[in-house]
UniProtKB/Swiss-Prot annotation:
InterPro entries associated with the record: 6-PGluconate_DH-like_C_sf, 6PGD_dom2, 6PGDH_C, 6PGDH_Gnd/GntZ, 6PGDH_NADP-bd, 6PGdom_BS, NAD(P)-bd_dom_sf, Pgluconate_DH
Keyword set includes RNA-binding: no
Stated name of the protein: 6-phosphogluconate dehydrogenase, decarboxylating
Function description: Catalyzes the oxidative decarboxylation of 6-phosphogluconate to ribulose 5-phosphate and CO(2), with concomitant reduction of NADP to NADPH.
Species of origin: Staphylococcus epidermidis (strain ATCC 35984 / DSM 28319 / BCRC 17069 / CCUG 31568 / BM 3577 / RP62A)
Pathway assignment: Carbohydrate degradation; pentose phosphate pathway; D-ribulose 5-phosphate from D-glucose 6-phosphate (oxidative stage): step 3/3
Enzyme Commission number: 1.1.1.44
Domain of life: Bacteria
Length: 468
């Protein structure tokens, strides 16, 4: 008997996705390069329609045609090697789905190469971590549309379900569109986390709040417009005590790791010529956190103000909340503007409102306000920037004073807030009819004869700035 779908790669994500698929009524063949992992999964799957195979030949032969194969192997050369091993065994119109954390440019390359061999290739972003993989992730598949249609029932079944019952999966677009959207999703995640961390820094270092007070504050914020998975878990984190009955989070070394997708997002923004300042500052913040020894040394010799607050703490705490929400809006505005530009350049025809909808459950950035983003694009599918939508425009105009005060207070007290600072600078730059770039262009013309345009007349101009 042949199975309906196969999974290659049985690390925690592949294993959990295989179990998720099987739990929805599909029979699953599994294969792993290491026989041990396959045997372990079989032992952990009594009574389930999980069928082990121990060679790629056996694996491919075990699948019904057209074959549907989900690759959950390490991104990069390992994915290429797995595809190279499978390719001679496949038939025309078989479907490979790469669910790894893959660079979208690799997906474009693989999609093109496999199409020349009459093999369909779907690059699919998977968000939600190991728990989401098992119970329902947010899925972002891109590739051939007809191939997606052949696997859409399975993907719809395993995806997370929003409160209205909709599955958190949709066809994203051709070739690398799915992995591209997942990349930007991860970049937005970096910014969300950094902005929350800066809020915590203000609470702790400026307002002198205890871990219990901080936990309660985040729990209260999660009951309002900031409701989201990351705010929810932050409240939980500050409640967790260690063996000494002290806040565990305060014992964790302050060096933040990363897998590189935030950096990819920032690099792509530079290539597109799109301002992505908040996400990029969040990436840099992780970089500077990683040079712990340098910071310890610098802290002993580079002096600055000592944080001191004399105002009403409750009032200022509300300003931090508003600053966080406005900065979050600015970050998403930048991320969605980046996806809009990439969609135009690559002819992907991304449905930006639909992207917000599939992030409502299953993924790390799930949040209440994603519905507001969907509403914004429903009202105007050609919306240039989320800040121009009536709802978001009203919020940022109302909350800007709070963000300005939070940034000014943080600077005056020496509390670093690169994400908040980038947010208000982006807002002010975006709303400026005139920026001092005219001087930069004059300088470029002065030293390099790069020419310039004028406001008052048509044409391209060059000036001899100093008479010989």
């Amino acid at each position: 008997m042949t199975q309906q779908i196969g999974v290659v790669g049985l690390a925690v994500m592949g294993k959990n996705l295989a179990w998720n698929i099987e739990s929805r009524g599909y029979s699953v063949s599994v294969y792993n390069r290491s026989r041990q992992k396959t045997d372990e999964m079989v032992k952990e799957s009594p009574g389930r329609e999980i069928y082990p195979t121990y060679s790629l030949e056996e694996f491919v032969e075990s699948l019904e045609k057209p074959r549907k194969i989900l690759l959950m192997v390490k991104a990069g050369p390992a994915t290429d090697a797995t595809i190279d091993g499978l390719l001679p065994l496949l038939d025309d119109d078989d479907i490979l789905i790469d669910g790894g954390n893959t660079n979208y440019q690799d997906t474009i390359r693989r999609n093109k190469a496999l199409a020349e061999s009459s093999i369909n290739f779907i690059g699919m972003g998977v968000s939600g971590g190991e728990i989401g993989a098992l119970t329902g992730p947010s899925l972002m598949p891109g590739g051939q549309k007809d191939a997606y249609n052949k696997v859409s029932d399975i993907l719809d079944a395993i995806a997370a379900k929003a409160q209205d019952g909709a599955s958190c999966v949709t066809y994203i677009g051709p070739n690398g569109a799915g992995h591209y959207v997942k990349m930007v999703h991860n970049g937005i995640e970096y910014a969300d986390m950094q902005l929350i961390a800066e809020s915590y820094a203000m609470m702790k270092d400026l307002l002198g709040m205890s871990h219990k007070e901080i936990s309660q504050t985040f729990k209260e914020w999660n009951a309002g417009e900031l409701e989201s998975y990351l705010i929810e878990i932050t409240g939980d984190i500050f409640n967790k005590l260690d063996d000494d009955n002290e806040a565990l989070v305060e014992k964790i070394l302050d060096t933040a790791g990363q897998k590189g997708t935030g950096k990819w997002t920032s690099i792509n923004a530079l290539e597109l010529g799109v301002p992505l300042t908040i996400i990029t500052e969040s990436v840099f913040a992780r970089f500077i956190s990683s040079i712990k020894e340098e910071r310890v040394t610098a802290s002993k010799s580079l002096k600055g103000p000592k944080a001191h607050f004399e105002g009403d703490k409750k009032t200022f705490l509300e300003k931090i909340r508003k600053a966080l929400y406005m900065s979050k809006i600015c970050s998403y505005a930048q991320g969605f503007a980046q996806m809009r530009k990439a969609s135009e350049d690559n002819e992907w025809n991304l449905k930006l409102g639909e992207l917000a909808m599939i992030w409502r459950e299953g993924c790390i950035i799930r949040a209440q306000f994603l519905q507001k983003i969907k509403d914004a694009y429903d009202n105007n599918e050609n919306l240039q920037n989320l800040l121009l939508d009536p709802y978001f425009k009203n919020i940022v105009m109302e909350y800007q004073d709070a963000l300005r005060e939070v940034v000014a207070t943080s600077v005056y007290n020496g509390v670093p807030t690169p994400g908040f600072s980038a947010s208000i600078n982006y807002y002010d730059s975006y709303r400026s009819e005139d920026l001092p770039a005219n001087l930069i262009q004059a300088q470029r013309d002065y030293f390099g004869a790069h020419t310039y345009e004028r406001k008052d007349r048509e044409g391209i101009f060059h000036t001899q700035w100093v008479e010989e």
